[in-house]
């Protein structure tokens, strides 16, 4: 490793719990929610989710997710199937999760693509839209001096602000699994865990052991 201090960032952590609750009609549980997310990048697990009063939201999430998958086709069917099979929700989108495991995209079982509403051309479609959006933003930036900016939920600027101002901020970061941050994943693997940021830098938090089925899924990608 180089002497440069680095941390891996992804926005799937901060865009996990709130959209999940809204998809399931649980908008009233968003304010004050508490969560624990850990695993590996693009395969982090929502291990615990509670409302502002400390009530476990998973029993209701599991019930509603099963009902929604049985009742209609929607954009998150793969991850809701994860909830049914593994008991937990995954941070990364359903279209990507279908690519990260051997269960859904099978040449011998093409009917699974339709059953789980998997968009095989999602990434090229997203790239086309991004390029169009960038061109639009360039035109707006070059022709207007009065544009306003709304800060996104991406971590980078908030990390810099917190270190400079000696504040405290929590992120989900990707770091080497030193000190058994996740006990049942390899010590030299890169894991995604909660991290506290302050004036002294970034401090990964120990999670302990993942449920065995979740660790096994992570290992298919670590391997």
Placement of each model-derived feature along the sequence:
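Long, compositionally biased stretches enriched for glycine and/or charged residues
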Residues: 3-5, 12-223
């Amino acid at each position: 490793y180089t002497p440069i201090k680095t941390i891996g960032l992804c926005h799937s952590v901060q865009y996990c719990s709130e959209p999940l609750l809204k998809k399931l009609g649980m908008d009233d549980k968003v304010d004050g929610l508490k969560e624990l997310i850990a695993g590996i990048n693009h395969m982090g697990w929502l291990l615990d989710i509670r409302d502002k009063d400390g009530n476990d939201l998973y029993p209701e999430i599991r019930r509603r997710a099963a009902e929604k998958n049985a009742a209609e086709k929607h954009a998150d069917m793969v991850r809701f199937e994860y909830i049914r099979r593994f008991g937990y929700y995954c941070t990364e989108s359903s279209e990507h999760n279908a690519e990260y495991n051997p269960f859904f995209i099978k040449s011998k079982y093409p009917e699974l693509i339709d059953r789980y509403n998997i968009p095989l051309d999602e990434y090229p479609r997203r790239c086309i839209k991004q390029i169009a959006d960038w061109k639009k933003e360039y035109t707006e930036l070059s022709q207007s001096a009065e544009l306003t900016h709304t800060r996104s939920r991406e971590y980078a600027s908030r990390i810099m602000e917190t270190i400079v101002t000696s504040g405290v901020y929590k992120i989900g970061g990707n770091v080497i699994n030193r000190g058994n941050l996740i006990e049942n994943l390899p010590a030299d693997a890169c894991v995604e865990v909660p991290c506290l940021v302050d004036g002294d830098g970034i401090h990964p938090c120990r999670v302990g052991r993942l449920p065995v089925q979740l660790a096994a899924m992570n290992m298919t990608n670590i391997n």
